[in-house]
């Protein structure tokens, strides 16, 4: 049941972070032949098979891939030291040939490097940043800079044989390649009728709470918050 709920959440939120307004800057959509970098800014990535499945998916879509130099490093429960994880993220942001950054997993650790990331090059050549869970830290920071990101599945959570995962993958592909997305959400007796307009922002509640009072704190004024 938990897995089903998580999969559904991924489907519904696969690109909720990027808003349907002209306020935020939208990175260029991907095209066949573009390169996606897989890296781990937080928890240790021991599951090489999961990365291989992610690579196979990218190749199926006609995309090239590059792995972070420190992707499989280990420093306690982190994917390498703070400096190593920061180096991979900075390289991906600065390399104009990298059109999207796909975080391999969440966990904990992105908040330890976020203040040291230089987004100068990213702002000149924005690219998609993809992930959920601990990657909420990146979503929040990049949103404050005025750019869209994608709250979507990651290699560690990718289970290609699960039906709900197939829906999530389809949603991710549509979002990355600029195809229209539609969502059907079941009604609930607890819903209140009404209309709301605004950018959809949010992510992992514990991460949003931990960033309160920091420069990465997400702005919810006039926004639609999803958790």
What residue spans do the PLM features occupy?
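Short Gly/Thr/Asp-enriched flexible loops that form oxyanion-binding sites at enzyme active sites
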Residues: 107-124
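Conserved anion/nucleotide-ligand pocket segment
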Residues: 148-209, 213
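Active-site beta-loop-alpha substructure in enzyme catalytic cores
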Residues: 205-227
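Short, acidic/small-residue loops that bind anionic groups at enzyme active sites
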Residues: 119-142, 148-154
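Structural motif
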Residues: 100-102, 130, 224-227
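ATP/NTP phosphate-donor binding region
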Residues: 19-97
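Bacterial Sec-dependent N-terminal signal peptides
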Residues: 1-22
